[in-house]
Amino acid sequence: FRPREASGLVELTLPTLGFAGHDLPAGGGGFFRLLPYAASRWAIERVNRVEGRASIFYVHPWELDPGQPRFAGLPARSRLRHYLNLGRTAPRLRRLLRDFRWDRIAAVHAAEIAAPGALPAWSPADPATRRPGR
């Protein structure tokens, strides 16, 4: 994690997978769907074991819906990026949930989030902390 002194926000980074001199995202999303399951598993294990910290993972809801509408006329690259392996995402996610222990970010990273100045105080009921125009 990296605290952002000026803003008070806390950045919790996603795991990456080093490949051919590049850091590829390995914390979920399209890369979880497009890359082999072993790539995500390896990246998460590395974060847990080598870096000694909990990994963060996310999935887009649409990536769990193989029956989503298909749009005609999309370029091949877009079709691959959006539709490839849609039917595999839910089974992979179930496997990932079995293979590792998971919890909410607020529970796993409570110390970092609670650090003085880590996050600005906010309340939907407090006009002083409400965003302008809301």
Locations of the language-model features?
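C-terminal domain-boundary segment and adjacent tail
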Residues: L35-R134
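Active-site-adjacent pocket scaffolds in enzyme catalytic domains
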Residues: F1-Y58
